Structure formats: C-alpha cells, structure tokens
Amino acid sequence: VAQLDTREKLAILADAAKYDASCASSGTAKRNSKDGKGLGSTEGMGICHSYAPDGRCISLLKILLTNSCIFDCHYCINRRSSNVRRARFTVEEVVRLTLAFYKRNYIEGLFLSSGIIASPDYTMEQLVRVARDLRQVHDFRGYIHLKTIPDADPALVEAAGLYADRLSINVELPTDAGLVALAPEKNALRIRGAMTGLKTAIDDNKDARKHYRSAPKFAPAGQSTQMIVGADAATDSAIVATSASLYDRFGLRRVYYSAFSPIPDASAVLPLKSPPLIREHRLYQADWLLRFYGFSVPEVQAATDDGALPLDIDPKTAWALKHRDSFPVDINTAPRERLLRVPGLGVKSVNALVRARRQRRLGLADLARVTRGIDKLRPFVVAADWRPDDRLDLRPKTARPVQGELF
C-alpha cells in the first residue's frame, strides 16, 4: 500500500464504505457526556441524512479500516483483483479521526468495516482494538457499529460486542446459489453459523442482565445484516422470504438492502447495469409490511407480478388492488389489523384513529388530520361522511415514482 497521509486515506476509505447500507443507530442504549464525564453521545441531532425508525437523525463516520482484501468476490469494488487505489488506516488513526470528527460536531458515532487483510482473525482484532480504545482509553460514549467477520474466532466477535452498540454480519446475497456463483470463497453455512453464535451471545447477555445488574452490556442495539440486490437472479419474492427467515432465526434488528452498482473491470457474470433504485425502496417497504403491519410472507409475495414488486406503486397498494374484496374498510368499526392494510395509513395514523374513534364517529376531515393526504385513501375507506364508488381504475391514480441517483 502506498504511503498516504490521513486526508488521502480518508478520501479513499470513506468512498469505499459508501456501498455498505448498514449504518443506522436505532435501538441502542442512551448515553451522553452532559455530566462532564466521558466523551460523545448517542442522543444528539447531527448532520447525517440517515434516519432511525424512531425519527432521530443520526450521523456516523462511516469508513473502512482498509479496502485491501484477500477475497475476490465478483460484485465487490474492493475485491483482490480490482484495479483500485488501496489504503489502510492504523487503529490509532481511526480513533483520532473519530474523536476529531465528534469534537467538531460532525458525527455522533462510528461505523467501521474492513476488507480482509492477512486473515479474518487479524482483521477482526484490529476492529476490536478500535472500539476498545475508544471506550476504555477515551471514554467515548457515542454510537459504535462494527461489521464483523464470519470466519473470525467467535471469541473476537464476543469481545467486539462488549464495546460496540451494534454488530452486523453480511449475508451478502439473497440466495446460497448466488453466493456460490459470485463469492465462491465465502460460505453460507459459516455466515449463518456466525449469526447464530451472535444471537446466542446477545440472548445470553439479556438473560444475565435480568439477574445481575453488574453484567456488562453486549451489543445492546442487536445485530443486523445486508444483502446486495440485483447482482444475481433472485426475485423480490425470494428476497422477502429470505429476509423473513433471517428475522425469525437470528432476531435481527434490521435487514438492509443495497442495490448492486456496476464496478470497473467487472466480471462477465455480473449484470451490465444496476437495477432501478426504486426496487431497493420497494423492498424496504415490503420489509416494513412484514415487521410492523402484520403481513405474512405469502401476502407480500401476492403483491408481486411474477416475483417482482411493482415499481410504480408501493407493495401495500399492490396487495390492496389484488384484494378488492377486502375493501373499503370502515375507519369507525374496523379492527386495527384491518386498518393497517389500508394504503396510505401508517402505524401512527392507525393508532391515532383508534384512539379518536372512542370519542366520536370519524369523517374524512378526521382522516385528513392524521395523514399526509386523503386522495389515496378515499377508494379504500368508509367514513361517517364518505362511501367510495366501486371503481376499477385505481392504479392510474397512484403517483409514479421518480428514479433517483444511486449516489
């Protein structure tokens, strides 16, 4: 690796980290240094453009320890055979950068990942050292997310959990077949084994803390994972099924989806262009239907067309249009579970409606007060002053999405 100064390394390794989507700090324990002790906070409002599910804006220094790697995964810009400029931080440099960025109020924490150098154990040791030094030497109380390495010694992963708020292990691709084709040096069984070990450690720690107040916290924000979308032939139906299985088996806080981006000197086995970015967005919406709206995997899959989620409408609307017999729903009498199926109604809106209807019968004006707009809702609801016509041309009424840039 060429001799570079810290600024040059930061430019390379921050850019290399942009392909990792797993960087939200929701769910961690609240800590701050308002009492004059320690340094950092997980509570402040930073300058980040990422938002946690509870609505907090979070800012993280997101970097790689190094973009050198002994693996040669076809889809990865940092693969062994890639002709990219390489850089590597020392442990001390990452610690100094994190503290310097925090003191300037640029960040609330650190997201740290790495290519594999020398061996999985050696690389994992370096990541753990960063987190340990921040916590123990500098009393850093901000958020830390470490991307762990499946092939590393489980003892190193357990050590990481003592210092990091969240740990994550990437499943990489939605299917085992995709992993074999595009990352033959990685092993799906080892990845799932590492995720199982991490779940066990998290569960054991929760149990210990119920009985012993002095038990140290272990990855209090849990574990997450990420999969690349569009690099292989996996359908949205298959991706949804995989995600549901991951949530169920490993108690994940989040599954992140990252749209495949074409890379220089790409292998012939990769697609020539990236999937529409809106596809990634539709998968996140489907993910939320599973986690917060009571949809089953078959129900979400029923919203697809030949395994693909529609790009022009959201998955809940797609499901509703295929189940016209379930609508309209009376907002004054329907159970909460049915209200959650109405396109345009979110969890907070439904909860507000359920509370309000205990006091009076609700009309469209009440509905408008708890939603962004009622035009989308009108065909699917009955209110005290509204009953929709039985229209068949609902799909054209939905707004078409605008394709954004990947970066």
Each PLM stretch: what is its role?
Residues 1-68, 380-382, 386-407:
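Flexible, acidic/Gly-rich N-terminal and inter-domain linker regions that tether
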Residues 60, 73, 112, 169, ...:
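Conserved, mostly hydrophobic/aromatic
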Residues 63-92:
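Canonical Radical SAM [4Fe-4S] cluster-binding loop centered on the CxxxCxxC motif
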Residues 70-72, 88, 101-111:
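Short, flexible active-site-proximal loops enriched in glycine and acidic residues
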Residues 95, 100, 118-300:
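Conserved AdoMet/S-adenosylmethionine-binding subsite of the radical SAM
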Residues 268-341, 376-407:
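Long, highly charged, low-complexity intrinsically disordered interaction regions
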Residues 356-357:
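Residue-level signature of tetratricopeptide-repeat
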